[in-house]
Amino acid sequence: MIKEELELANKEFEGSDAIFGKNLLTFTNRINSSRGLMFSNMLDQLVPLEHTELPRNYTNYEDMVGKYSSAYYKNDEEKVIVAKLSKFDNNPNAVYILITKNLKTNEYDIIERKAGERLTETYGYKYNNEHIDSLVEGEIINKDEVLYHSTSFNDNLQFGYGVNALSMYTTDPMTIEDAIVISKSLEKKLTSIEYDTVRISLNDNDVLTNYMGDHEKYQCFPNIGEEIKDFVLANRRRISYSQALYDLKDENLRKVLSTDTSYYVPFGDDMVVDINVYCNKDPEQIKRTKYNAQIFDYYDSMIAYYTEIHRTLGEIVERGEKYSDDLAYLYKLSGQIIDPNYKWEDDNKKVFGNIILEITVEKRIGMVEGSKLAGRVGDKGIVSEIREDEDMPILPDGRRVEMIVNILGVGGQMAA
């Protein structure tokens, strides 16, 4: 059995470059096996950057890797956009779906516009949505037309996974033991994107304080497209009837008290990209006040959005048209969301009593001292210092060095 499997594998890889695996993205004829293994390990740990650059030295396998990526949407057949349904009226391009019809097979499908994709934990990648945002109802989408792609691709769908940093080998004392000094400008170029979803449970006696507002405007949390203030997404206060007058005083609602629960989203410049509100009570029985007005604005937007989705998709389903599995799933989901008798569960799989506010945050994560950097030939190091651009060496042509590494490491790594 083992012999047969080996013979089958030998036929599969015979004459193929695929046997080199991830090392096709490095220069296998210029490095030894230890550095090749190091590069392969580092490749598994990389985070997609907000803005990538094409490598100056191509191995010619970068685009092949990008071709098999799932981080872009290429249209498979010629389609027409039947409808564009937006979730937020005041920010129509934040979240929406396109309902399309295949002009060859007459099958209906949906395309969801998202800011990015969340992967394991909070890791993820951002989409470039410029093209899909420019499309309108009635427009034809051509075959092989790319509607959106991750920031690892350029407009020609060429793949990149890092940046080209102007580097200098020297004996700077801050570069000992594989330490690396980078400039402020390189720090910004190495910004990555993460996505976090925060769920805030609100009981009958809970209110969100006026953390984002002022004495004229009550605002509990950032609106779509707004940045988070001081790493705090929202501040929940449980009202005790014995001190309700104190807790609900306008001045105190703009403060964070010791008994409050603050929802933090640390480590980055954060922006809200999506909001959902789930309610297990009859909304008509909940008194609307200034404390929950912002929450119910988003609840009303979500219900209106999914009501329109359910109505539009329902017409397609009831006519007996051909439609995709994605369309069928969204039709069922939208029906659940607008069903007043459907009960939602919390993170503990228990039906909650009042409201859960779900906020999706896009986080811009910059480099800090202690961050790891890796090159394309199995080289790596830890950032020891981030210097101002004017403190970095300057070349005869006026360019500033972006990264300083230890010259003694060259000989040491050649022997590794």
Q: Which residue stretches match the model-derived regions?
A:
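Conserved phosphate-binding elements of NTP-dependent enzyme cores
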Residues: K343-W344, N354-A416
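Long, charge-dense accessory insertions within large macromolecular proteins
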Residues: M1-G366, S371-K372
